[in-house]
Amino acid sequence: MGIRRYKPTTPGRRGSSVADFVEITRDHPEKSLVRPLHSKGGRNVHGRITTRHQGGGHKRAYRIIDFRRDKDGVPAKVAHIEYDPNRTARIALLHYVDGEKRYILAPVKLHQGDMVSSGVGADIKPGNALPLRNIPTGTVVHAIELRPGGGAKIARSAGASVQLVAKDGPYAQLRMPSGEIRNVDVRCRATVGEVGNAEQSNINWGKAGRMRWKGRRPTVRGVAMNPVDHPHGGGEGKTSGGRHPVNPKGRPEGRTRRTKKSSDALIVRRRKQNRRR
């Protein structure tokens, strides 16, 4: 993937950039692997906003991605590399020798015409999926399961990768992009390689309208609102809010205050955090 930068012909074009899409080989999805996707606009079943800053955007169709990679021993050919509006990564359409078609995340160095497979006997090359116990230490992987057979949960976005650093009994130790080292069951599957489209993070969107096309609405500061709309609202002239930062419902904002998760017991080393002085 490369990035094409625009000349400053308009204020919105100044500094903006776009992906060149040179790796894309087809401009329409496989019909049998597409489902309708209904926009919720951040509302729940009662019509109330539960997630702010969502709504609008271009209509999308959902591409069904194979995150389980459970078709063992059946080789597949990469028929196309396609664009997916629902994620930052590109997707690869696989044609299995038995006639089935599936989508997977397209890793780096996977091209149209390549062969991929999954299972214990698969080779260690980009796009192949194996249990962690069958992957050599030091290998870079993505699309990793947290529970055997549960489907990939870790390292699925563009440019994401995790390194297998050690194996100890029933667990494999993975180094996350954040620096965290976590134990994962060796029976869990992972795909060899790094997710493609790594330059995605370098795109300059240029104007608010491109964010609206993606379904992202503006984020308004609470101190710019009225008291009826936000706890920080109101006051004469410009104010600082007069209290510690809170969300519109009055709950503390900023640092997360999540309860302990059961999977935290599998963390070997925490990620490095910027500590306040």
Swiss-Prot record:
Do you know which SMART domains this protein is assigned to? Ribosomal_L2, Ribosomal_L2_C
Q: In which domain of life is the source organism classified?
A: Bacteria
Keywords carried by this UniProt record: Ribonucleoprotein, Ribosomal protein, RNA-binding, rRNA-binding
Task: Output the Pfam families linked to this UniProt entry.
Answer: Ribosomal_L2, Ribosomal_L2_C
Would I find RNA-binding among this entry's keywords? yes
- Region: Disordered; residue ranges are 37-58, 222-277
Point to the regions of Basic residues compositional bias.
Answer: 268-277
Choose one Gene Ontology CC annotation of this protein and give it.
large ribosomal subunit
Any GO BP: cytoplasmic translation
Query: What InterPro entries does the record tag this protein with?
Result: NA-bd_OB-fold, Rib_uL2_dom2, Ribosomal_uL2, Ribosomal_uL2_bac/org-type, Ribosomal_uL2_C, Ribosomal_uL2_CS, Ribosomal_uL2_dom3, Ribosomal_uL2_RNA-bd_dom
Q: Name one GO molecular function term.
A: transferase activity
Q: Which Gene3D superfamilies match?
A: 2.30.30.30, Nucleic acid-binding proteins, Ribosomal protein L2, domain 3
Its biological purpose is as follows: One of the primary rRNA binding proteins. Required for association of the 30S and 50S subunits to form the 70S ribosome, for tRNA binding and peptide bond formation. It has been suggested to have peptidyltransferase activity; this is somewhat controversial. Makes several contacts with the 16S rRNA in the 70S ribosome.
Which family, according to UniProt? Belongs to the universal ribosomal protein uL2 family.
Q: How does the annotation summarize its subunit structure?
A: Part of the 50S ribosomal subunit. Forms a bridge to the 30S subunit in the 70S ribosome.
Specify the protein name.
Large ribosomal subunit protein uL2
